[in-house]
Amino acid sequence: KRQEGRYLSFASGKQRLSIQSGKLGTEPHKGHFTEKQLFVLHWQGQEPKDNEFKVAAGDKYLTSDLSLTKNKSHGASFAIFDNGNGKGHSAQELKSGKFLTLKGDNVTLEKKPSSLKVFAVTL
């Protein structure tokens, strides 16, 4: 069920992060944003400075192995960083210390920070 509000979409190069057949994948970064390209960050902190979020797509949460689960407690915690100087953002999975990376059609966690463009989308 689609909700009204603000969503985030993540892109790198010519690809957008998306849900493909119930799994995390990519789609071409062009045209209008689709529902399967929209994500919500759920803040897990207690103090305003806390940088810890669960990433949700609909009623499912992104896990540390980049699969999806309906169980929020099994969702991975991520930190979102501004890379500065217009170089985009990076999303670090906190348990592994690795960064969410879009490489062609693949989504992986890598040791080196990647550059993600983040788009705020209102439906």
Model-derived regions, located:
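Lectin-like carbohydrate-binding module/patch detector with strong preference for beta-trefoil
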Residues: 1-123
